């Protein structure tokens, strides 16, 4: 069980969006590397980074900011947004990323994801972003007819390190994680699932530690951390206690 702090990059800055809308971006820190260091100092063990411009462009846009983050923190970093080819994947992993997150390409070209898992075992995650229960692609700008579980099951046995499941309808608006759909996905596949979108308060952290939620690899928090709705020490202490109880 891991709490992943999120750094979403837009135009080189650390921002949060509301409902995935690039026009509704709030800048939380103009220096993403400093934010990465701060999260490490607070005791977080991982970092979740998204290149928002890259997700729309289909290629890396905030590469300099990501490189600065990698230099600033010793924590493992996972990155999504605009990573669409084996060359992109290899390039980023060689630059120090722990794992890449493949989203749009997982819908458009599942075979590439399977090949990437074979070539880079344990270092490829799949990002499934859903709106109204259907998978969205191209930086959430396009909806598909593909169901969440249907897509996830395509990667059973492929060696996907994790599925990052984001409920777009809740992202950045602090209404709480959609536990029903997240746990339904976790029950449907053997791949570890990370919850994203809507984490709002310590209530969600406590919910994470309940027995039925401990099948999850963890959850991602963005705005709730930046707005001070979650106390990092209290949250991490709760999660550590839950881990001990699971041993």
Swiss-Prot record:
UniProt record, GO biological process: L-histidine biosynthetic process; L-tryptophan biosynthetic process
Domain of life: Bacteria
Active site: 8, 129
CDD domains per record: HisA
One family name in Pfam for this protein: His_biosynth
GO molecular function, one term: 1-(5-phosphoribosyl)-5-[(5-phosphoribosylamino)methylideneamino]imidazole-4-carboxamide isomerase activity
Stored InterPro entries: Aldolase_TIM, His_biosynth, HisA_bact_arch, Isoase_HisA-like, Isoase_HisA-like_bact, RibuloseP-bd_barrel
Major localization listed first in the record, in broad terms: cytoplasm
Enzyme Commission code(s) on record: 5.3.1.16
Cellular component aspect of the GO annotation: cytoplasm
Catalytic activity: 1-(5-phospho-beta-D-ribosyl)-5-[(5-phospho-beta-D-ribosylamino)methylideneamino]imidazole-4-carboxamide = 5-[(5-phospho-1-deoxy-D-ribulos-1-ylimino)methylamino]-1-(5-phospho-beta-D-ribosyl)imidazole-4-carboxamide
Biological or metabolic pathway of the protein: Amino-acid biosynthesis; L-histidine biosynthesis; L-histidine from 5-phospho-alpha-D-ribose 1-diphosphate: step 4/9
Compartments (UniProt record): Cytoplasm
Flavoprotein recorded as keyword: no
Keywords for this protein: Amino-acid biosynthesis, Cytoplasm, Histidine biosynthesis, Isomerase
Record has Cytoplasm as a keyword: yes
Family: Belongs to the HisA/HisF family.
Name of this protein: 1-(5-phosphoribosyl)-5-[(5-phosphoribosylamino)methylideneamino] imidazole-4-carboxamide isomerase
Organism: Rhizobium meliloti (strain 1021)
Designated gene of the protein: hisA
């Amino acid at each position: 069980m891991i709490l992943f702090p999120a750094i979403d990059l837009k135009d080189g800055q650390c921002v949060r969006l509301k409902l995935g809308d690039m026009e509704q971006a709030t800048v939380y820190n103009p220096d993403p590397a400093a934010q990465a260091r701060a999260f490490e100092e607070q005791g977080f063990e991982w970092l979740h980074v998204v290149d928002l411009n890259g997700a729309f462009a289909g290629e890396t846009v905030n590469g300099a900011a990501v490189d600065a983050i990698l230099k600033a923190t010793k924590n493992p970093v996972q990155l999504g947004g605009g990573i669409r080819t084996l060359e992109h994947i290899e390039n980023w992993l060689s630059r120090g990323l722990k794992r890449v997150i493949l989203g749009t390409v997982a819908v458009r070209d599942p075979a590439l994801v399977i090949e990437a898992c074979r070539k880079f075992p344990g270092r490829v995650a799949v990002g499934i972003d859903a709106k109204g229960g259907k998978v969205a692609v191209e930086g959430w700008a396009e909806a598909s007819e593909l169901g969440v579980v249907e897509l996830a099951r395509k990667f059973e046995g492929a060696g996907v390190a994790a599925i990052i499941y984001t409920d777009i309808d809740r992202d950045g608006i602090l209404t709480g994680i959609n536990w029903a759909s997240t746990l339904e996905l976790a029950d449907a596949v053997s791949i570890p699932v990370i919850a994203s979108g809507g984490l709002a308060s310590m209530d969600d952290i406590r919910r994470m530690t309940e027995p039925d939620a401990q099948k999850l690899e963890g959850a991602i928090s963005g705005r709730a951390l930046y707005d001070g709705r979650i106390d990092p020490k209290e949250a991490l202490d709760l999660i550590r206690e839950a881990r001990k109880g699971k041993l």
